[in-house]
Amino acid sequence: MKTKRLTKLLMASAIALASSATTVQAATTAVSASKASVAGTFTTGDKTFLLNGQPFVVKAAEVHYPRIPRPYWEHRIKMCRALGMNTLCLYVFWNIHEQQEGQFDFTGNNNVAEFCRLAQKNDMYVIVRPGPYVCAEWEMGGLPWWLLKKKDIRLRERDSYFMERVKIFEQKVGEQLKPLTIQNGGPIIMIQVENEYGSYGEDKPYVSEIRDCLRGIYGKELELFQCDWSSNFEKNGLDDLTWTMNFGTGANIDQQFRRLGELRPNAPKMCSEFWSGWFDKWGARHETRPAKDMVAGMDEMLSKGISFSLYMTHGGTSFGHWAGANSPGFAPDVTSYDYDAPINEYGQATPKFWELRTMMEKYDANGFALGGRKGSLPAVPKAPMPIITVPKFELKDFKPFVYGCDSIAKEGGLKTFEEMDFGWGSMIYGTELPEIPTRSVLTADIHDFAQFFINGKYVGKTDRVKNEKTITLPPVRRGDKLLIIVEGMGRINFGRAIKDFKGIVSDVAITAVMDNHEITWKPQLWLKIRIPDDYNSAVRALAAPADDREKDFAPNGRGYYRGYFTLKKVGDTFLNFETWGKGQVYVNGHAMGRIWSIGPQQTLYIPGCWLKKGKNEIIVLDVVGPREPVVWGQATPELNKLQLEKSNKHNAPGDRPDLNSATPATFSTGGGSATAKPGNGWQTFRFQAPQKGRHIAIEILSTQKDGDRTAIAELYLQGADGKRLSREPWTCKYADSEEDNGNHTLDKVFDLQESTYWQTEKSAAPPHLLVIDLGAVQTVTALEYLPRAEQGAPGSMKNFKVYMY
């Protein structure tokens, strides 16, 4: 009996010692990230990553150094450590480092090497994603605007000029980061090749050339990987690279890795972007995702030994003009990149943070379960600055918009921003009109926000967000002056539309009916005035003496406003701009970002590290003009207040087609209705004969589960050649039910994002009707349908009909 007890005691002691040894080993391995002089290894093993030869689960926090003021970098890194993360994941943004061709900047807030050194100082490894394309809801996906000065350039392809510039950029990044790879004693354990290329195209030779470029810079020993979605990763997967998946909270994780497991059963699994929330766009509600779904997904992955990078762990702010835009259509992103992440925009812990931290205590530093014990995570650091408020104050100094001019071209025809060697800001286009004694319609493709004036009087606007391309003009006399103020917003960062020129990108056609004949004029001579959106231009404008420019180019209220506020103590604050129109804000010389009264973002985050005791300066460039030029600082952000001219819903009664006498398309299976299968993944439904029409109407008769709200993640149509039709021209025509509070509107079925979805309102039962305008008459041979990505594919449609007209 005593022998058995002694044996049990010895076994228990051995287990405890082994557990202790494992914990010590994990701690030692993690701490080794801070030992810059010790070379290490990071490789793939049998179903696991190997750090210095030992199994290792990557628990990465995605953070972006340009979205965080440099004085706050270390605090944000410590916040990630306090969540139990062992790695930081970051993009390298080409266009912030090479804003003008050949001029590289890796200093100050662009010092990516210093950010990596701070990670190592705080016992964290680093995964680097150097593009060249990064997406990230960032201007042009990180590609520099000046590439578009070569109008025929083929972006993200083996275009000779594009690849030449890519290799120069990657070499410059390598000079900064190669000394910091794990083989050289640094924290960098992996480098990503390109980014989600399967969502862009299929071009293994291009992806291979990017791989070869990076391998030549960093050496054969450093682990290279590529990320994509489970639906498209095979398109460009290279045999000698590690493959990782990107998906969002709530996704069916086994389903996401199913195909990878079939192809590479012994490979480690990693979700390289596990989306904690989502990004916001102007004119739509603030995006949120449930904490419980995020935490449950991460817990499931850790329990199965699956590595991850939480995108975003801390989103930060797209300061200045760096916020991008989504596509199809044009959906510009707001300045805040809060992302509903566990660490909010201003670096504080959210309820998500605490729920996640509690779960992460179950796992050790290397990502392995502690067997029911609760581990000890690093302490949550104190915020570097307090939150302060600022009393309301008025911006009293004013100069009209045109005083910001830095270049005038008086000859020639229309030119885009890029043809004017102009990256960001606004342009004024001017021309003289012919005699048109009746009302006329002006048609033009303008990127992005245009305001029209005749002899200085405002006559209307077009907004690319709303796909507006026409405006009605009043009768005019010969010689009347037409002015068009065009503001360029963030360039598209996702999909084929990243080749996003700014300004007037087509002819301007003015059409009128006179004596029963339609007559069209296309003005050929245009004045072109550049108005940059940088701080120095704003200061010059406000200091310029008044002259006769005001007479011709001073649309009422549009221009530069300056004011001052005094602080007794410094801290972070949120300046409120809900009484303003649209434009840019500068505080003490720092470009804080875009504002737009439509919301949902009404405040800008102002870091205390960029403020000072005493007098602080603020300049607002408002291209529309404020209702009242006042600002105040509040203690919390306002990220979910819309001020729209009309609802985002697409349910105008006049847009609903009458299908009572219409004949639905016949499917290849026979009959005028089809039945979708339950479960996740793409499904294709072919028509018995090609269908023709400009509009497609989908009538959903039932869902897989009674009582479910109906939902669709993505739709594609196949053309006569069996290939997917471009969705760039598509617009929403009608939906009988949409949940706009959660941004589950009709446009989500063609937004190129498999994790977002259209969904009906809670009380709405089938049948439902969706109508999409394809932009032109199309021949359609099949419909592709993707249900929601969550377990069980909630809201999946079952029986449905399709009409084209």
Question: Model segments located where?
Answer:
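Aromatic-lined substrate-binding rim segments of carbohydrate-active enzymes
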Residues: 73-139, 211-219
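Catalytic-core region of carbohydrate-active enzymes that cleave or remodel glycosidic bonds
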Residues: 217, 250-344, 348-351, 355, ...
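N-terminal carbohydrate-binding accessory modules
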Residues: 26-87, 117
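Aromatic- and acidic-residue-enriched segments that line the glycan-binding/catalytic groove
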Residues: 102-110, 121, 131-157, 207-211, ...
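Disordered, acidic Ser/Thr/Pro-rich linker "stalks" and the adjacent N-terminal cap
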Residues: 411-412, 545-548, 588, 656-692, ...
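Aromatic-lined ligand-binding clefts that engage carbohydrates, nucleic acids, or primary amines
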Residues: 439-453, 482, 565-588, 595-596, ...
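Active-site neighborhood of glycoside hydrolase catalytic domains
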Residues: 162-238
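Short beta-strand-plus-loop segments that form exposed binding edges in beta-rich domains
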Residues: 484-490, 620-627, 699-706
